[in-house]
């Protein structure tokens, strides 16, 4: 397998039979519990992250194959944060979404899940 990194667009291309693209990720800033994010739902924060990523990379939402998001604490009102965030940010409803809840390392686990999905 050959890998090529385009630092300008921060995109990793893995070249094999088919081209597979792993797009740069993003996150919301850390804040103390019960402060500025107090009145926001989880999916709203996720929506900001997804929209920011789409804007930063210039990626058309119709080209997204999958959304994997990490969250520290799940919320009963937003059971699948990835799905609801994706829909709220304009990702088509045919796109598979998964939410990873694993305390402080959920983002790392989401990245690993994405890599595993690409490699399979």
Language-model features: locations:
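Active-site-proximal alpha-helical scaffold in enzymes
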Residues: 101-120
